[in-house]
C-alpha cells in the first residue's frame, strides 16, 4: 500500500478556487482538508483542476500506426492535461466482435501514457458479439473513415444494448442524405455542401426516436442539431470555419461550417448548451492530406483541446465552469467512471495551470506523429504539471514518466 501524502494548493472546488490539502492514498483521493496534518505534502503554485477526459480519440492502434499509435497519442493527451481517453473502434479492421477487441487491447499492451478505455462498433445487428469490457458502442449512421453507414439498428440489438447498459455514441450524419449530396470536392466549402447540416438533422431525428438509455450525438457542427440525446462538440467546430485557409488540413466529418454557423455554435457552448467537449483526434499522414478531393477526413486535437479553452477562459470568453463541466466532470461521469471530481474515492488526477503563461500553439512542439494542427498560432495555456492517480507524469511542462496508463473496462452492473 502506498503511504498517504497530500497535494496542496488552490483547487477548483465547488465552482471556485480555494486552498485545499487533498490526501492521496493508492492513487485515489482519500481526504479533502484545509490541513492534512502530519503527512508528506507537495505544494503547487498556480491553479489546480481535476485532469480532463477525452471520450473521442482515434489513436490508430492497431492497423494504421504510421499515422499515430497509442504511445504518441496518449503522450499528446497528457501534455494537454488529459489523463483518460476513450478510443474509437473504426480501426483499419473495425472492432465489431470480442476477438477484434481482444486483439486491439493486446496490441496496445503497456504503451499508453494515459488511462484508457475502448469502444466497440455497433453495426445494427452484432450486439451479441461485442466484448462486455467495451466502455460504450459507436454507431456510424453515415460513412466515414474505415466505416460504412448503419441506417437501422435492429430491435434485438437495442434490447441487448439496454440490457448491458452501454452508452452509445452516434456519428450523426444520415447515409441516405449523404448519398444524395455527393459531389466533386475541391475545397472546404465544397466539403460542407457535400455533407450538409441537413444530414445531421436527419440523423438527429432518428437517434431521438431510439429507445436507448444513454445516447450521445458526436461532434455536433450546428446549433440546429438538437434532440433527445446528449450533445458532444469539438474545438474545431467551435473555433474554425470553412472560410479559413486551412485546405485539406481542415477537412473533417462532419465538415467545418460557415462562419455564421460556427459563431452560433460557440455562443451555444458558452451558454452551457453542450454536455461534452471532445477532440475527435484523428491523425493522418501528409500523403493522406495531399490532394483535397481525395484527402482523408480528420485532424489532430487531443493535445490542444483543453489548453485552447483554458486560454479562452482566461480571456473571459468561455466561462471556466463550462469548460470544467464539458471536458472534466461530465465525460467520465456519463460512463460511470470515478474521475473528474475532487471527491473521496475518485482517482487523484490533476493538472496545474499558470493562467499567466499563455503561449501560441506551435506544430513543432506537439507530440503527435504528424503534428500539423489547424490551431497552429492560436493562444493556449498548457498545464505545467499533470498528475495521474497520484503520480506526476508532467513536471514543469515536460514528461518524466514511462507509460503507466491502465485499461479501464466498462463498469459492470452490481
From Swiss-Prot:
Entry annotation: catalytic residues: 280
Catalytic activity: (S)-dihydroorotate + H2O = N-carbamoyl-L-aspartate + H(+)
Domain of life: Archaea
Pathway: Pyrimidine metabolism; UMP biosynthesis via de novo pathway; (S)-dihydroorotate from bicarbonate: step 3/3
Residue numbers carrying N6-carboxylysine: 138
Residues where substrate binds: 58-60, 90, 284
Family: Belongs to the metallo-dependent hydrolases superfamily. DHOase family. Class I DHOase subfamily.
Function description: Catalyzes the reversible cyclization of carbamoyl aspartate to dihydroorotate.
Protein name: Dihydroorotase
Organism: Thermoplasma acidophilum (strain ATCC 25905 / DSM 1728 / JCM 9062 / NBRC 15155 / AMRC-C165)
Gene it is expressed from: pyrC
